[in-house]
Structures are given as C-alpha cells and as structure tokens.
A protein has these predicted regions:
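Conserved Rossmann-fold cofactor-binding substructure of NAD(P)-dependent oxidoreductases
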Residues: 59-73
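Conserved glycine-rich Rossmann-like NAD(P)H-binding loop of the short-chain dehydrogenase/reductase
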Residues: 26-42
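Rossmann-fold cofactor-recognition segment
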Residues: 46-62
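A glycine/serine/threonine-rich, flexible loop-to-helix segment
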Residues: 176-184
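Catalytic loop of short-chain dehydrogenase/reductase
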Residues: 90-91, 99-101, 107-111, 120-164, ...
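Conserved mid-core segment of classical short-chain dehydrogenase/reductases
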Residues: 79-98
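N-terminal Rossmann NAD(P)H-binding glycine-rich loop of SDR-like oxidoreductase domains
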Residues: 12, 20
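Rossmann-fold scaffold of SDR-type NAD(P)-dependent oxidoreductases
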Residues: 9, 74-83, 129, 169-170
Length: 184
C-alpha cells in the first residue's frame, strides 16, 4: 500500500469513478468528490477503506477552499467534473453558459489554487484536466462546451508553466459509448 493520495473531482460516476477505482487498484488512496454528499460518501464506502468522499460543487467556487481544507498532502489531482449542455446561438441560455464556464474554468482553477500548498512539488505529482473533443469537433448544441474546452487547453498550458515540476496534462475525450449521454 502507498501513502500517496489522489483527488478525483467528479469521481462519483463515469470516467472519474473508473479512475478512482484504478487509483485504489494501484494501492494509492483516493478522495472522490461529487455534488451530493450522501451519494459521494456512499460511493466512497463502496470503493473501500482507501477511499474518502467529500461533497463539492465546483460550480460554487467560493466554497471550494473550505470543502477541501481537511485534506493533507496531495500527489495527484484529476479534474473530471462536468455537466451536460446543449446551448445553441439561436436558443442561447446565458445562465446555463455562466454556470458551465464557472464550473469548468473557474472551478477547475480554484480547485488547483485551493490545493496548491498541499500538492507535492515533484515530477511524480500530476494534474489532469478533462476537456472534451468538442473543442476541435463541435456538434449542434455544443457552442458553450466547445468554447470552454478550448479554454481548458489554455489553462493546461498556463498551469504547466506555473507549476513545474508538477506535470499538468489535458485529456479531451469524445462521447463515451457506454455513458448516459450516448443513450440520448
């Protein structure tokens, strides 16, 4: 068993949950976050004694620092929290767009900022930010998502520069075939 702790924001479903399972399988400790406290804690309990669940809604960035205050040293951070969106220019929903920009750009940034003094400053520490393929291949209704995911690229580049030697990478998957979004 390892003393390494990996935080997976958005770790209660989808890719985030699968990554959390992989972290545990490798012998590390994982902290998963999700918006719903009861659900997050239940999923952490299912993952076992090397998992902890914390309620965290990164679309409310002013609460992030306080919600993560109890964490010790962090050896890896995965930012995989998302919300689905179908915002077109003809039916543009400003409030929905603001929420998504806040969640993915401001929320991701504030999460890194809140954990900065606890991120092990070594090349063995990594941060992974999830964007999405829509940054390069937009689809009908992806106006906001495509724009935000382009912003994730800029964020990855800036964080890599500012946080070296910590590794910072971005992943931009397309629609995952076994996800609920695929069924829609």
């Amino acid at each position: 068993m390892s003393d390494r702790t990996i935080v997976v924001v958005g770790g209660t479903s989808g890719i985030g949950l699968e990554l959390a399972k992989d972290v545990i399988a490798k012998g590390d400790r994982v902290v998963i976050t999700g918006r719903d406290e009861a659900r997050t804690k239940a999923i952490a309990a299912e993952l076992g004694d090397r998992a902890e669940g914390i309620a965290l809604d990164i679309s409310e960035p002013h609460s992030i620092k306080g919600q993560l205050a109890g964490l010790g040293q962090v050896h890896g951070l995965v930012l995989a929290a998302i919300e689905r969106d179908a915002n077109t220019i003809r039916d543009y929903d400003i409030d929905r767009a603001i929420r998504l920009v806040t969640l993915k750009l401001v929320g991701y940034t504030e999460t890194v900022h809140a954990l900065l003094d606890r991120l092990d400053p070594s090349v063995d520490t990594g941060i992974v930010l999830f964007g999405g393929r829509a940054k390069d291949r937009p689809y009908p209704g992806s106006l906001t998502v495509s724009s935000i995911n382009g912003g994730v690229v800029g964020m990855v580049n800036a964080l890599a520069l500012e946080l070296a030697p910590i590794r910072v990478n971005g992943l931009h998957p397309g629609i995952i075939g076994d996800s609920p979004f695929w069924e829609d």
